[in-house]
Amino acid sequence: MQVSVETTQGLGRRVTITVDKDVIENAVKSELVSVAKKVRIDGFRKGKVPMTVVAQRYGASVRQDVLGDLMQRNFVDAIIKEKINPAGSPQYVPGEYKIGEDFTFSAEFEVYPEVELQGLDAIEVEKPVVEVTEADVDTMLETLRKQQATWKETDAAATAEDRATIDFSGSVDGEEFEGGKASDFVLAMGQGRMIPGFEEGVVGHKAGETFTIDVNFPEDYHAENLKGKAAKFDIVLKKVEERELPELTEEFIKRFGVEAGSLDGLRAEVRKNMQRELKGAVRNRVKTQAIDGLVKANDIDVPAALVDGEIDVLKRQAAQRFGGDEKQALELPRELFEEQAKRRVVVGLLLGEVIRTHELKADETRVNALIEEMASAYEDPSEVIEFYSKNNELMNNMRNVALEEQAVEAVLEKAKVTEKATNFQELMNQTATA
């Protein structure tokens, strides 16, 4: 086997391989012998067909299969010999072949980039320092009450906390536009579902009133014909409802798994859950900054094959989230996922190099701690832990999570980490919008 390697462009490589004619002929003969033992041809007993007849009938297809197999096997041997690390499958380009002669083919593919980590000591990370206060617990209890609230119709003017049922009809420059009209639309105030100024225009009005509000569509509005345009909405306010919050009774408290039904017990449970959320939010905030800094400090080329594979993964994940099938997923425009896919590949390559250079392996103690932390959010943590322990795929996924955390910690050891005091709500808001 003769091998030559050349760089085509960037990470692209072309390996040209020549296979000796004797290797081909021996492989063809061996395969024909195997075929002769199995085929049935009229006039001959099974296994007794002369080789000349077998070769005449099956020689061409056997030779084609042998050449395909030899291309794959010789490619693998070549990249091992040349110490090449391909990213993705190669594209084979067979040369002209004549029986009794050597066979030359080429394989085109991309390689993984050579990553040499740099700039780790210039990465800046702000670590949030937060405590769950009694006021934070009070706010969370109020949120729980709102989630369990009922709605009661009122004659009072609508407030920013109410729910309104309206008919509306919008126009721009006196012309109605698509999607600008609805009847019996239930508007929950404070959720930001409408364009800026719409909810504010409803506040202060009572059921039975008809009025017009003036608003402006944002410059980044999704409909091109409405971006930045001034609009009028004619509104009929049909019903206003106000929240009725439940009292913190024993019955209410027991809904959240606090069997004793005591307020102190509920506060303790809420605090525990908030502290778990806080721990995860701080960890993710620090991790995001560390990875952002790592990516910024290391500009690397990425193999298109890896990006394509990641795009397919993201498409399938999107289909699962929105109830589509795999065929529909693959038809989604790749442009929707390309940037995210490329970043995921870059992050994977960089963290992989951190893991390699630091000789990291998943810490089983950390793996178990992560499983226990995740399981603590369920009603029966021991059942979840046991389920994980018996599922190799889930355990390996958790080992990958642990290994990624260890890699991030290795980056943080060299980064400039400062602490910044903040509060629970501010951190949660940052996490939600990240």
From Swiss-Prot:
**Cross-referenced Gene3D superfamilies:** 3.10.50.40, Trigger factor ribosome-binding domain, Trigger factor, C-terminal domain
PROSITE patterns found in the cross-reference section: FKBP_PPIASE
Key words of the record: Cell cycle, Cell division, Chaperone, Cytoplasm, Isomerase, Rotamase
Pfam families linked to this entry:
FKBP_C (PF00254), Trigger_C (PF05698), Trigger_N (PF05697)
Entry keyword Cell wall biogenesis/degradation: no
Task: Give the main localization category.
Answer: cytoplasm
GO molecular function, a single term: protein folding chaperone
The record's Gene Ontology cellular component field reads: cytoplasm
GO biological process terms, alphabetically, are:
'de novo' cotranslational protein folding; cell division; chaperone-mediated protein folding; protein transport; protein unfolding
EC number of this enzyme: 5.2.1.8
Q: Where in the cell is it found?
A: Cytoplasm
Please list the reactions this protein catalyses: [protein]-peptidylproline (omega=180) = [protein]-peptidylproline (omega=0)
Residue ranges occupied by any PPIase FKBP-type domain in the UniProt entry: 161-246
Which SUPFAM superfamilies does the record associate with it? FKBP-like, Triger factor/SurA peptide-binding domain-like, Trigger factor ribosome-binding domain
Domain-level remarks: Consists of 3 domains; the N-terminus binds the ribosome, the middle domain has PPIase activity, while the C-terminus has intrinsic chaperone activity on its own.
Family per UniProt?
A: Belongs to the FKBP-type PPIase family. Tig subfamily.
**What's the stated role of this polypeptide?**
Involved in protein export. Acts as a chaperone by maintaining the newly synthesized protein in an open conformation. Functions as a peptidyl-prolyl cis-trans isomerase.
Q: What is this protein called?
A: Trigger factor
Q: Which organism is it from?
A: Erwinia tasmaniensis (strain DSM 17950 / CFBP 7177 / CIP 109463 / NCPPB 4357 / Et1/99)
